[in-house]
Amino acid sequence: MNRRALLAAASVAGGAAAAMAVLGALAPIAAAGPRPRLPPMAGRRVLVLGAGMAGLVCALELHRVGAEVSVLEADTRIGGRSLTLRGGDIVREDGAAQTVAFDRDPGLYFNAGPARIPHHHQGLLGYCRELGVPLQVLVNDNRAALANGVPLSQIRASMRGLVAELATKALGAGLLDAPVSEADMLRLRAMLRNFGALDREGRFRGSPRAGWVEPPGVAPGTPRPPLPLAVFADPALWMAADFAEGVNYAATMLAPEGGMVRIVAALAAALPPGTIRLGDPVLDVLPAEGRVRLAGGEERADIVICTLPAPLAARLPGLSVARRAALSGVTQEPAAKLAVQAPRFWEAAGIYGGISWLPEADITQLWYPSGGFHAPQGVLTLAYIWDTPRGLRFAARSPAERAAAALAEAATLHPELPAVARHPVSVAWGRMPWARGAWAEGSAVPPFLSEPEGRVHFAGDWLSALPGWQEGAVASAWHALSAIR
């Protein structure tokens, strides 16, 4: 099957969303590219607007070549959307504030923004290596997790078995569009038997790959039965089972020990004290003069690097009319997350890390912690929402209403959860005042937005082929730095 046929089949089966998921899985890996070789910049002053990933990468690379760097951050913390929440932290959305009530334990934290790093995101991983950020494996795909209450192991085994059985029948009916020798036909049949765990007659009658109704011990055990073909008319099941085939979701996935904020903290620690100024929002930028207006005055620089999210950069009146219009057209996805602290009851069911799916529910996904196994308590990401209507619906609720709705939906997978879950905390990124959304995926970003305007350069994950990924922020930072002369 060629690429076009595969996309067409996905579109018929699951609509445009499925076709886009397949397209993402087939797309080439967008790497950060080579790190720019900057000229010596002693005596030159640079203002970096924003202390998220892109801003901190720019600041560190400029500091390394001798520039005098100041980072101006509107928020009271660094990191932007790289946000790790622990007990005592405060989340401030428009019109609501939440104090995180998790127990003060090093293993109890919630990555409310990015939570995973693909193994091929070598720009970001390079900084982890250089700066000594310890990493752990993140369990992204777990066969013991569930989709609509069905174990992913059972779904995957049934998918493979049914597809292999259908393909074997096609071979027997001579439906291949190219001649195949008898020897190759035997090899193809053997491959399909192995792929789908077929019997000698080419039939799928079940397999231990599906997991167990009764696990083996002294007795041999009873595998879960095959799922009927009609089950797979629902694309939610097979997409949940196969999402980790996408290049950005395949093992090995990684995460910093102790939370994603460890990376931005390491970048900030590598800068001279006083480089980063918090609580200092930018009101305007004058590109021709390198002037930046703040609530408390004005700053001048030889170079300004703006790493603000597009909706915030669009508010800067000194930028050109064309740029501001284009920035206003970059729509941010209103993704959201919610987490709770709970006893690790899921481990008693054999679930150690990974993601369960409720594709038709608002919460969409549940993420189980990938570390601290067998500890008394864990932080369960009870909702990860990226669909726009669901994200807007979630954001419109109060934190208490979000938690009640999420627990009710999650109880269809884990009935014990409402009785044991504590300390819910949620982040709706569209309501975070210094983000105004999670990523710009789906938006048409005009290429000229990544080009400098006067003395002002621009960076951010939304200006890369990897919006929503920290590697995209690194790539865009390197691109902006490469234009400095």
Listing of model-derived features with the role each one plays in the protein:
Residues 45-75, 116-121, 127, 133, ...:
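Conserved beta-strand->loop/alpha-helix structural units within folded catalytic cores of enzymes
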Residues 38-40, 101-109, 241-252, 383-393, ...:
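Short glycine/proline-rich turn/loop motifs
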